Amino acid sequence: MSMFQIILTKLISTVLAVVFIPFSVLTGGIDLVTSGGHTDTAKTNIVGLGAIFRSQGMTTDGETFYFSSKTTLIRTKTDAKTVIDADYSAIPDELKELGIAHIGGLSYYDGYIYAGLEDSKVWDYPIVGVYDAETLDFVDYYILDCETVTRGLPWVCVDPETGYLYCTDHSKKPTKLLVYDTASEMEFVKEIPLSFSVPSIQGAEFHNGTLYAATNDETKAIYKINPVNGEVEKHLDRNLLGGEGEGMTFITKENGETVLVAMDMGTIFINAFVREYPVN
């Protein structure tokens, strides 16, 4: 994104921030009314166009956040608001010709952003897209076997210790983890049966060797999955009223505390919350 585009984006964002003040109050009020069951410890409310650009996946390189919408990628400071860079047409024409129209969950690994790409409602091309984390430029893609990945690719996650990429066999009712090697052109490595199905995973990240998965189930729960034996344990319920649970990541704050950061679309879908949750 050029300097002119950055300045223009910031100017538009500032103007819209003023315009959307009433909506910010409204959505914040709705969230406050239902906050008795919430388990977050802090939150950022993003209203209007900004919410659209933060409506699917998220990840971090440890210093900045990355967010996806169905067709865009943006990079922000860890306040989740200040845009550093953006690609508002992040699906290349080559993939659009295959029907790809949806960017899902993201995962940062070794200078790249790995993204689940889908031809939604068709499910012929489950694709892992690779983007340069510094520039957001599209770099490469890998088409997975649609007979193995049977209902799209709403999320992917790379284990930073092994370079293995994880996903599931089904977007709604998965029965196993599927593992691919990023160092060998996404060669299939193995499958790991889950102890029970984790429904509607929207995004996942590794922390201390455990795979954490954020879902859009009834309580928008976050689960912990052992990547060795597939044992599943619920970590917490987000207990959100309506809306939609989205992606997640981890960030270490200036005080040294590591927190789980998860995103959700608000009840009336004109805002997005980026919330912090305890890791332990």
Language model segments and positions:
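Conserved blade-ending motifs and adjacent loop-strand segments that build the rim/top face
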Residues: 232-252
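Beta-strand-rich domains and repeat architectures in extracellular enzymes and scaffolds
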Residues: 46-71, 102-105
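Short coil/turn segments that connect the beta-strands within blades of beta-propeller domains
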Residues: 62-63, 110-111, 161-163, 208-210, ...
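Blade-loop segments of beta-propeller domains
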Residues: 82-118
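A short helix->beta-strand "capping" segment at the edge of beta-propeller domains
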Residues: 30-52
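Structural motif
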Residues: 72-77, 122-130, 173-180, 219-225, ...
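Short loop/turn segments immediately following the C-termini of beta-strands
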Residues: 70, 118-120, 168-172, 216-218, ...
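Surface loop/turn motifs at the tips and blade-to-blade linkers of beta-strand repeat domains
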Residues: 46-51, 88-90, 94-99, 142-151, ...
